[in-house]
Amino acid sequence: YGDSGKPPTNSSHAPYSKRNMANDMAQLMDYLGHESFHLVGHDRGGRVAHRLARDHSAHIKSLTILDIAPTAAMYAATNMAFARAYYHWFFLIQPAPLPETLIGGNPEFYLRSKIGSWGHVSDAHTPEAMADYLRCFTPETIHASCEDYRAAATIDLIHDADDADKK
């Protein structure tokens, strides 16, 4: 999110769907003159990369996806341990402005606690990097983050189910 664009949303969350993001990436690669390319995605970007490969397969030379499993499979396998570790999946999909308001009450605390829970090295982010994360963690960024998760729990699941037979 950060300095990236944050389009207005709608009730379907389509502007934040992985399909919409993948289409943006495909258009960018076309604009840059890349008819085909190797594609790597990590975490949320891995979901976008997967959608790009499904919708624009003729452009993909190879695909590497890191640190994800299919969203529907993750929801289907949800148990207490998953819900505890991935609580934000369920918190961020709540209707606006609930998560935005709660996070916005102390955005620095929320961001530091989330980033601090990633990995096993508590000081992995330099003070300069953390300052930049905090600079970017605006109300618009918080809303865009929530919209990404809302799309994942709604329209992205529909898109994935519609073409489940594609590799």
Report residues per predicted region.
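Flexible "cap/lid" subdomain of the alpha/beta-hydrolase fold that forms the substrate-access gate
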Residues: S4-V40, R44-K167
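Short, polar loop motifs at secondary-structure junctions
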Residues: Y1
